């Protein structure tokens, strides 16, 4: 099993939803940026373990059809924060991002149980080893590049482009520019 927080309680206070969860030991990977090789290995180990889970037992659908439908609903409801777009898409509208996603959809999906937002703050480490995942609201059955793209983007932002190749090598994948661009663009809608 993959360690993750357990929900202890949920409630609404002053119109705000709250979850009370257990803590995981260790610290998120942003605390490991001074040890980039260790960070890459922990991230790769954690994602390999998550992606090795049996897809047949995952009831959560985050395949492209589901993500594009959710993204379209968020665009229609005005829930996409266009001011938070990455520099490559700054100045675009949420509708333009959705249109690009529809026009550039990759063929086929390499389905795994994916985290959905596999950035460094959402992966926990303890004593140089993988300790679990947090912020799993987008977890579900999805293309493995859903996680690899977000992980690579987070590596670039936090420790630099030079560490993408060691991370992918440790994970056991090769760079896929088209899928990287696609899933980073998809992330703008969420």
What are these regions (language model features)?
Residues 1-63, 74, 108:
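ATP-binding pocket architecture of kinase catalytic cores
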Residues 15-16, 188-190:
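Regulatory N- and C-terminal appendages and interdomain linkers associated
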